[in-house]
Every structure is written in C-alpha cells, then in structure tokens.
Amino acid sequence: MKKIKCALIGPGNIGTDLLAKLQRSPVLEPVWMVGIDPASDGLKRASEMGIKTTAEGVDGLIPHMKADGVQIVFDATSAYVHAENSAKVNAQGAMMIDLTPAAIGPYCVPPVNLKQHVGRREMNVNMVTCGGQATIPMVYAVSRVQPVAYGEIVATVSSRSVGPGTRKNIDEFTRTTAGAVEKVGGARQGKAIIIINPAEPPLIMRDTVHCLVEGKPDEAAITQSIHDMIREVQKYVPGYKLVNGPVFDGQRVSVFMEVEGLGDYLPKYAGNLDIMTAAAARTAEMFAEEILKGELVLEPVAA
C-alpha cells in the first residue's frame, strides 16, 4: 500500500507523541522531524527511529521536500511562527495541519466537521487546541439538538504535559478554543478556560463543558446525542470517557469528561496530547486517502 509522506515541525511533547501515532498509520509515513535545538530529546528520538532530522527549523526542511515527496506537514511549534512556516510549506505544494492555536486555516474537529473539509482543497487546516478537541464535540452534541446561547469549557491538564510552546500560547489557546466553541460547536457565545495543574503525581486530563440552552432542555434527546458523540470520539481516542452527566439544572447542561492517553510518549495521564495528535492524524489520513485516490492534487501556493 502506497503511503503519503509527512514531515513534523516541532519535536516537543505534541510532535513526539504525534510521531508515534503516524508510525502506526496505514496511509501516512513520517519521514522528517524538524526542530531548532540540536540537543532536543525529540530530535534524538526521531533520529533513532530512522527519521531524517534537521535543527535548522523549516528552512532546513524546505530544500528536501520535493525530493523526499513530502505532501503533508504537521506544525506542532507555536502560534507565533506558524504563519511563516505555513507559507513556506504551501509554496512547496504541501498541505499544512496546524496543531498550534494560530488558526489561520479553518478549524477541524474530526467527529464534528471533518467530512466538510473533504473536496475543499484546503492547504491549511487548524486542529484548534487539546481543550477544543476534548470539549467541542460535547458542545456540538448539545447544539445539534437545540440552540446553545452560551458554551463554556474548562480544560484541566497536568503541568508536566504542557511544554514551553503551549505555555507561551496560553492567550491564543483560550481565544482559539472559544472561537471554535462558537464556529464548530455551534454556541452563540463561547468561552474557554485552561487550568494547568502542578500536582504530582500528574493528574489525568479533565474537561468540564457547560451549555446554556434556549428554552427547556430536551433531556432525553440531549443525553442520547452526547452518548452518540462520545462513541464517535472513542473511535480515535479510546480513553475519552464520561465521568458525570449530562447534568441538567434549569437551562444549563453540564458534562464532565476525562481523557486518558495511550501513553505513546508521556504516560496515560497526558490525554491532552492524545486527543490533539489523534485528531491531527485522523484528519491527515482523510486528506491522504483523497490524494491516494487521485481526488486531491496539491499544488504550490505562491507565498
């Protein structure tokens, strides 16, 4: 079976976890890992796996992309450098899957809107944030039953799973997640809160979703919709589970989730890495399948 070749930019927690997932993919083959620090653990690991590496940033990758047939690039760096990375990669005729909160391309939350991205020839799609991937399916599960006037999500993650890039991007994280709670989740107004918990041993990712619906909540239909959506997310993140809810209090619907990872890079408490990387891999696989079928031909985009 032919595979589509990929490159990863950013050998941190997210990039390293994503690499493990891509190595199991039936349609994607990771061939490059790009960093900026020659001593980085992520670059060392990639190199040991036989993957080509560069510590010269994206500029170290660009000259090799055509020769190595790289068609999909994942950016797991920081919102601040993403636009520049994306322009350089798109100019080489490769598409970009953005795992930073830069959000210059359309948001993608696979169980909600992945199919809408098929056939649109997008050269950049944004995976929102780990908090967004964990909670937006729940907001959407409510909003597809009845209108949501306000959606609020709280993502609690272990300090150890949050690397320096994510810490620098906290403001972008909350803005991008809130924007996607509205655009993808369907809430008229969205709010996002992230809590980084320093407890040791590290705590598993926890997510709380509150929705204020219009009118009296249709409890049976909302409950059914939430359980259906959880099954969809579990197809690619088996550790996604409902801890409590949906709890109905007047017009408020609350759902309490927990996300356990597969333990590919950081231990299982870091479900925030998994939900992000599994969603990105799932998205890339869909585009790769289109390319393999000849339905999607990527073309260079003038920078």
Swiss-Prot record:
SMART domains in UniProt: Semialdhyde_dh
Annotated NAD(+) binding sites? 161-169, 272
Q: Which domain of life is it from?
A: Bacteria
- Protein family membership: Belongs to the acetaldehyde dehydrogenase family.
Question: InterPro entries recorded for this chain?
Answer: Acetaldehyde_dehydrogenase, Acetylaldehyde_DH_C, NAD(P)-bd_dom_sf, Semialdehyde_DH_NAD-bd
Q: Which GO terms describe its biological process?
A: catabolic process
Q: What is this protein called?
A: Acetaldehyde dehydrogenase
Q: What reaction does this catalyse?
A: acetaldehyde + NAD(+) + CoA = acetyl-CoA + NADH + H(+)
For this UniProt record, the keywords arranged alphabetically read as follows: Aromatic hydrocarbons catabolism, NAD, Oxidoreductase
Q: Which residues form the active site?
A: 130
Q: Name one GO molecular function term.
A: acetaldehyde dehydrogenase (acetylating) activity
| UniProt KW NAD keyword | yes
What's its EC?
1.2.1.10
